């Protein structure tokens, strides 16, 4: 029984777990993408399921994406946009 648990744990660690999250998609400098080009295409191109235009204070209209993978950066409210 212990071998089965250890093998299962090892397989889980080897495979990895990819989570999906929602948020404002950003450039590497934590600045949001604005709504041009259309957000749905941008979000899908980056692995999300859909996207829409939403208002974010103080950035203005920005792309909100659903189900983005972990490797795509989303807005970190603790950091400023650095241009």
Curated annotation (Swiss-Prot):
Transmembrane segments: none annotated. InterPro entries: LCN-type_CS_alpha_beta_dom, Scorpion_toxin-like, Scorpion_toxin-like_sf, Scorpion_toxinL, Scorpion_toxinL/defensin. One of its GO terms (cellular component) is extracellular region. PROSITE patterns: LCN_CSAB. It comes from the Eukaryota. One of its GO terms (biological process) is defense response. One of its GO terms (molecular function) is toxin activity. Residues 21-82 form the LCN-type CS-alpha/beta domain. Expressed by the venom gland. Pfam families: Toxin_3. Its main location: secreted. Residues 83 form a propeptide. It is found in: Secreted. Disulfide bonds join 31-81, 35-53, 39-63, 43-65. Keywords: Disulfide bond, Ion channel impairing toxin, Neurotoxin, Secreted, Signal, Toxin, Voltage-gated sodium channel impairing toxin. Residues 1-19 form the signal peptide. Belongs to the long (4 C-C) scorpion toxin superfamily. Sodium channel inhibitor family. Alpha subfamily. Alpha toxins bind voltage-independently at site-3 of sodium channels (Nav) and inhibit the inactivation of the activated channels, thereby blocking neuronal transmission. Is active against mammals and binds with high affinity rat brain synaptosomes. Has the structural arrangement of an alpha-helix connected to antiparallel beta-sheets by disulfide bonds (CS-alpha/beta). This is Neurotoxin-1''. The lineage of its organism: Eukaryota, Metazoa, Ecdysozoa, Arthropoda, Chelicerata.
